[in-house]
Amino acid sequence: MPTLLLRLAGAMQSWGTTSRFDQRDTGKEPSKSGVIGLLAAALGIDRENWTDLEPLTRLSMGVRHDRAGIPKYDYQTVGQGTEEIVNSDGNVQIRSRMILANGKYPSGDHLGEGVQSYRHYLADASFLVALEGEDRSLMERTHAALRDPVWPLALGRKSYVPSESIWIENGLQDAPLRDVLARWPWIGSQRKWEEPPEKLLVSFESEDGSGVLKMDQPLSSFAERRFGSRFVRSEWIPLPHEVPHVPA
């Protein structure tokens, strides 16, 4: 079966599956829901369109950690604060600095309140993602769309842009997913002060129910946001011999 490769490299990327309210998490590797969403953006599949999205969700996914990245987080505030306003009658009024969507100022118990948010991400990470499926026509269209996407592509969040092309020139391979990940050249940028790793961590979808349970298998359109489970097993493989990497 054909295998499609994606290069996910950037200064910041985030692949959350359990984010709630003011806590935005990230996993240690790209989530399947996030990768499928990226493909949907490339193909121009709308958030309400399950018919065209569903074939993508049937692809098997593997991830190779060419550069694991450094877990970090941003502390953000969406705030108000207050200011003193002198009314026409000369009285001093305490007023919020923030204006609500309805054009009014917060008052009462909500005066001066602010929202704190913790947004976790991976810094300086590079992943080689492989997707395997039987529909070669779908794989070819998706590969072409990654080169000329309908909508902008991002690494988990709209502001997290890739530092290299997600599209890989020879990224559609007629070989099993495992074989492609085992032999494809390392995509971590070489730096003068560091040596390439001797081994790379890879994750595969498990068919026998072993491994780690992840709740990132899309079951509906992204507008409905329903996700199911899948099992993922990880192992270490030797670094492929062809190490030099030139961005596409």
Where are the language model's segments positioned?
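Short N-terminal binding/cap micro-motifs at the start of the first secondary-structure element
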Residues: 12-18
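Sparse, context-dependent recognition of short Cys/His-centered cofactor- or disulfide-binding micro-motifs
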Residues: 6, 14, 24, 30, ...
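Pocket-edge structural micro-motifs
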Residues: 8-10, 65
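Hydrophobic residues positioned within well-ordered beta-strands of beta-sheet architectures
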Residues: 4, 61, 127-129
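Internal, well-folded beta-alpha domain core
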Residues: 66-248
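N-terminal start-of-chain detector that recognizes signal peptides
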Residues: 11-12, 32-37, 99-105
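Glycine/small-residue-rich interface belts in oligomeric ring/scaffold proteins
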Residues: 2, 18-90
